[in-house]
Amino acid sequence: MAKLLLFLLPAILGLLIPRSAVALGTNYLLSGQTLNTDGHLKNGDFDLVMQNDCNLVLYNGNWQSNTANNGRDCKLTLTDYGDLVIKNRDGSTVWRSRAKSVKGNYAAVLHPDGRLVVFGPSVFKNDPWVPGLNSLAFRNIPFTDNLLFSPQVLYGDGRLTAKNHQLVMQGDCNLVLYGGKYGWQSNTHGNGEHCFLRLNHKGELIIKDDDFKTIWSSSSSSKQGDYVL
């Protein structure tokens, strides 16, 4: 099954943001970005740490790179080919996920259920067994306030917040992106009642009203898989 990524601004707006302008997320790493020594990605009880002993450890997730004491001042980088790479301070490679794919935009996301997943073409994920979490039905994935995973739903006045941007599914049925230099909306103000936004397993964003009538869609349907907005 594909693990695909929808980038919020490029996917919805067709805008391009310089990589240098994109700050490191608290629970994700974009291609070209680096997690420095003692850096963290966090999501709920899960904490991915690039330790000062050069070991990459997912706490409460029962996973590690097994590279303790293999280098100093190590850094984790996600390449433009979807490969996670740990490098020593001299630039030598200590560990890599060996999941190299086609060149493109990727995101390594610390999933709410404790998986570290690279979204893009299907490339790399670890599947730790965490009692009480791995047994959850997919629809019960804990909500993350800056990411939407298929098939999660954003209800009226619900929002996704990333740095100075907010994507809001307003109570008036309009989907609006606030913040930054650019703004955007679905132009569906007043077109329905009790509307909600859903990301389906084909990567399509859909606004429906309380009668499940489709008010708006991104028309970006792709192959069946797991997606993240």
From Swiss-Prot:
Alphabetized PROSITE patterns for the sequence = BULB_LECTIN
In terms of CDD domains, this protein maps to: B_lectin (cd00028)
- Secretion signal: which residues? 1-23
Name the keywords, alphabetized. Disulfide bond, Hemagglutinin, Lectin, Mannose-binding, Repeat, Secreted, Signal
Question: Molecular function terms in GO for this entry?
Answer: D-mannose binding
- Protein's job: Mannose-specific lectin. Shows agglutinating activity towards erythrocytes from rabbit.
Quote the protein name from its UniProt record.
Mannose-specific lectin TAR1
Look up and give the organism this protein is from: Colocasia esculenta
**Record lineage:** Eukaryota, Viridiplantae, Streptophyta, Embryophyta, Tracheophyta
